[in-house]
């Protein structure tokens, strides 16, 4: 449950599909790692340490990644609290880092991760392309990082879906001071789980 992590004042701020084709037999790419945290300038301009969470991603893996070498998602557990990593000289961000691990999952598995988590894609040495869809959820006051083109379906969406698909409030102040009509997710949570579930 994304709202169990971020709360109810959220929307979908990005969505994208990633396809990693198989490497050719002659490939010298190795693991093909490139360690990073998401959201670029946020990691430079936030002055606190550790930096605030602000968003989470849901990675929906469509391919069978139950074995390594298939373009697996690599992570360093616990690294979301580390603003920087010390990379080995010569290898830099391509290095296999101590404590890192590939995520091995069956097709259809959803993995929720903090945007601050140091992670990487990897090279695919399987016979099939690795396919995954990433959904990023953030607070409504954080600007989106891509379009949400659902206009043709808008009338069929329920109020919570409209909130998640960035329905604009009548006043910009209501991104940070929302009314119930702006955040039907809050109304739903309170109805089903009680007032304590929507605090603070």
Where are each of the predicted segments found?
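Short catalytic/ligand-binding loop motif for oxyanion handling, primarily in non-cytosolic enzymes
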Residues: 11, 20-22, 26-27, 120-122, ...
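Conserved double-stranded beta-helix
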Residues: 82-117, 122-200
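Signature of the catalytic double-stranded beta-helix
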Residues: 1-22, 42-53, 62
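Catalytic core of non-heme Fe(II) oxygenases with the double-stranded beta-helix
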Residues: 26-103, 142-152
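A structural signal for short, well-ordered beta-strand segments and their strand-loop junctions
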Residues: 11-14, 57, 74-75, 112-113
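A structural signal for short, well-ordered beta-strand segments
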Residues: 15-17, 58-60, 133-137
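Short N-terminal helix-initiation segments at or just after the protein's N-terminus
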Residues: 1-6, 48, 52, 76-80, ...
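Short, well-ordered beta-to-alpha junction loops that form the rim of enzyme active sites
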Residues: 15-17, 78, 115-117
């Amino acid at each position: 449950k994304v709202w169990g992590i971020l709360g109810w004042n959220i929307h979908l701020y990005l969505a994208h599909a990633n396809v990693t084709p198989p490497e050719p037999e002659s490939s010298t790419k190795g693991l093909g790692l490139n360690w990073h945290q998401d959201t670029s300038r946020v990691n430079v301009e936030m002055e606190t340490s550790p930096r605030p969470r602000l968003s989470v991603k849901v990675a929906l893996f469509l391919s069978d990644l139950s074995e390594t070498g298939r373009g697996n998602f690599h992570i360093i557990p616990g690294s979301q609290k580390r603003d920087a990593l010390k990379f080995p000289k010569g290898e830099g961000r391509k290095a296999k880092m101590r404590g890192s691990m590939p995520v091995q999952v069956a097709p259809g598995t959803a993995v929720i991760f903090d945007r601050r988590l140091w992670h990487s894609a990897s090279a695919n040495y399987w016979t099939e392309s690795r396919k995954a869809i990433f959904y990023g959820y953030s607070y409504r006051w954080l600007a989106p990082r891509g379009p949400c083109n659902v206009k043709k379906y808008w009338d069929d969406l329920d109020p919570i879906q409209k909130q998640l698909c960035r329905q604009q409030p009548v006043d910009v102040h209501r991104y940070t001071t929302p009314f119930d009509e702006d955040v039907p997710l809050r109304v739903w949570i309170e109805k089903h789980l009680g007032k304590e579930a929507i605090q603070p």
